[in-house]
Amino acid sequence: MKRIIIALLAVVATINVSAQELRWGVAGGLNFANERAKTAGVKVSSDSYIGFQVGAKAEMDFSSYLTDGFFLEGSLLYNLKGGSYSGSHTNLGYLQLPVNLGYRLTFSGDVSLLASLGPYVGLGVLGKDVEKVSGAKVKTDVFGTRLQRFDFGLNYKLGVEVWDQWQFYLGFEHSLLNLSKTKIEGSSSRTRVTNFYIGTAYMF
């Protein structure tokens, strides 16, 4: 998998990009995330955890390489996800890099429909289990102990662009890796994070 990602990045790096083909912007959104686990055959899913994402994005017109309407977009985001439970919650903050191949369907000069999908990689930079004990908050680190820091998954987006600058979208992303580091003799433990989000971006 790492070789595939490196090969894709190498191909993108060799493409000659003109100023007209590349746009930059800022992006942010609201997350509704869930932590899903399966231990010893028992499935547990958290309630929705409300987080956020914020960062910068770049978009490259791919019409010259495929057909009219195709584009490649990449973002560098701080993405706060996690899970909520009765009396506790989990904060999972990732430095995340999604790279999507998308298609733009233009209805008029001012309105376009956008659809895109692709992989993402994430590095956990903040991870805490937060529990209330006797009225006090007890925080426990999770990355490197309960969960691994590296995440890899798929990302899907659907939205609109108006006036060639403002983008509004809905998205969904989910882990493909088992994030759990918990080991139970004679059994298995699996943890994944899913996230539904709404967001906006302003392109310069």
How would you name each of these model-derived features?
Residues W24-G28, V54, L72-L76, V99, ...:
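Membrane-embedded beta-strand positions of outer-membrane beta-barrel proteins
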Residues I15, E59-S64, G102-F107, V162-D164, ...:
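Outer-membrane beta-barrel proteins
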Residues F32-V54, L147-Q148, K181-S187:
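Surface-exposed strand-loop-strand hairpins of Gram-negative outer-membrane beta-barrel proteins
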Residues Q20-L22, S48-V54, N91-L97, V111, ...:
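Residues that define the transmembrane beta-barrel architecture of outer-membrane proteins
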Residues N31, R192-F204:
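Outer-membrane beta-barrel "beta-signal"
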Residues S64-F70, D164-L170:
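Repeated loop/turn-to-beta-strand initiation elements of outer-membrane beta-barrel proteins
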Residues L30-R36, Y78-G82, L105, P119-G127, ...:
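Transmembrane beta-strands of outer-membrane beta-barrel pores
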Residues M1-A27, T200, F204:
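Bacterial Sec-dependent N-terminal signal peptides
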